[in-house]
Swiss-Prot record:
One of its GO terms (cellular component) is plasma membrane. [4Fe-4S] cluster 1 binds at C60, C63, C66, C109. This is NADH-quinone oxidoreductase subunit I. [4Fe-4S] cluster 2 binds at C70, C99, C102, C105. GO terms for molecular function: 4 iron, 4 sulfur cluster binding; iron ion binding; NADH:ubiquinone reductase (non-electrogenic) activity; quinone binding. It comes from the Bacteria. It comes from Baumannia cicadellinicola subsp. Homalodisca coagulata. NDH-1 shuttles electrons from NADH, via FMN and iron-sulfur (Fe-S) centers, to quinones in the respiratory chain. The immediate electron acceptor for the enzyme in this species is believed to be ubiquinone. Couples the redox reaction to proton translocation (for every two electrons transferred, four hydrogen ions are translocated across the cytoplasmic membrane), and thus conserves the redox energy in a proton gradient. It is a peripheral membrane protein. Its cofactor is [4Fe-4S] cluster. It is an enzyme of class 7 (translocase). Binds 2 [4Fe-4S] clusters per subunit. InterPro entries: 4Fe4S_Fe-S-bd (IPR017896), 4Fe4S_Fe_S_CS (IPR017900), NADH_quinone_OxRdtase_chainI (IPR010226). It catalyses: a quinone + NADH + 5 H(+)(in) = a quinol + NAD(+) + 4 H(+)(out).
Amino acid sequence: MTLKQLVTGCYTILRSIWMIGMQAFNKRETQMYPDIPIYQTSRFRGRIVLTCDPDGYERCVACNLCAVACPVDCISLQKTESKEGRWYPEFFRINFSRCIFCGLCEEACPTTAIQLTPDFEMAEFKRQDLVYEKEDLLIRGPGKYPEYNFYRMAGIACNDKLKGHAENETRPINVKDLLP
């Protein structure tokens, strides 16, 4: 080993120690995430939830628009009807391992049942645990739109009257009778 190599080696070691020492007193760039919560904007799109209307019923009418709008096909549901004639999903399933949190399902929902929340901590050890059922997604509250009730805005079906028998309503036309 020559004297030049010895001096160069000592210089590089001292330079490294000096750089580490100078960085020790600088402001930290790393955010201490679990201790200090991360700031999120008001438009942040996180975990998907299903909300209820002000009367306490679930808002989802199983129209399937959210599943059609989803670009990665992570939403699946099946429609059923209650005794009162109200539609609701028999099952509602979201596979969060495929979801890209784009928000298209929230925009497509006519009843504001699907809403994206600021929650983003959904880490799991098994991929099967990222498939959420309706019971996991349903929250007891109206979410972002507390006063909106789809059935009050769209109207309620009358069970005792047929189509066209209510006031100011014309009877439906059978289009097959119009054909030659």
